[in-house]
Amino acid sequence: MIALIQRVTRASVTVEDEVTGEIGPGLLVLLGVEKEDDEQKANRLCERVLGYRIFSDADGKMNLNVQQAGGSVLVVSQFTLAADTERGMRPSFSGGAAPDRAQALYEYFVERCRQQAINTQTGRFAADMQVELVNDGPVTFWLQV
């Protein structure tokens, strides 16, 4: 399971001209689900994402996680993160989970975030989405479990 996380001052996702999720300061999480992923991996990744200390403390040091910083989370499914790009000029998506399994794990990940009392917004699984964000820093990390 893969999360590309970006520290943002704001972010939103729109599907068919409808804003489905919008946050102020916090994390934009682009989430990719791979074939071998399960709930245990989703738990570990959620713990890492929410615990990752990439927000500045009073001394300007990256020392706070999203909850400590009072931030929110916007989770957007992105199957392209599971692409194999090592060869050729066209990515292979054979490493991605089947759509039904990927959706179940995506929804599980979102629910785990919400259980941590963090404002968690979402896109719409498998939809064509427009994501807008203001990357703060920029600060972007690739997390994989």
Curated annotation (Swiss-Prot):
An aminoacyl-tRNA editing enzyme that deacylates mischarged D-aminoacyl-tRNAs. Also deacylates mischarged glycyl-tRNA(Ala), protecting cells against glycine mischarging by AlaRS. Acts via tRNA-based rather than protein-based catalysis; rejects L-amino acids rather than detecting D-amino acids in the active site. By recycling D-aminoacyl-tRNA to D-amino acids and free tRNA molecules, this enzyme counteracts the toxicity associated with the formation of D-aminoacyl-tRNA entities in vivo and helps enforce protein L-homochirality. Gene3D superfamilies: D-tyrosyl-tRNA(Tyr) deacylase (3.50.80.10). It comes from the Bacteria. PANTHER family: D-AMINOACYL-TRNA DEACYLASE 1 (PTHR10472:SF5), D-TYROSYL-TRNA TYR DEACYLASE (PTHR10472). GO terms for cellular component: cytoplasm. It catalyses: glycyl-tRNA(Ala) + H2O = tRNA(Ala) + glycine + H(+); a D-aminoacyl-tRNA + H2O = a tRNA + a D-alpha-amino acid + H(+). One of its GO terms (biological process) is D-amino acid catabolic process. A motif (Gly-cisPro motif, important for rejection of L-amino acids) lies at residues 137-138. HAMAP family: Deacylase_Dtd. Its EC number is 3.1.1.96. The gene is dtd. Homodimer. Keywords: Cytoplasm, Hydrolase, RNA-binding, tRNA-binding. One of its GO terms (molecular function) is Gly-tRNA(Ala) deacylase activity. Disulfide bonds: none annotated. SUPFAM superfamilies: DTD-like. This is D-aminoacyl-tRNA deacylase. Belongs to the DTD family. A Gly-cisPro motif from one monomer fits into the active site of the other monomer to allow specific chiral rejection of L-amino acids. It is an enzyme of class 3 (hydrolase). It is found in: Cytoplasm. Its main location: cytoplasm. It comes from Salmonella paratyphi B (strain ATCC BAA-1250 / SPB7).
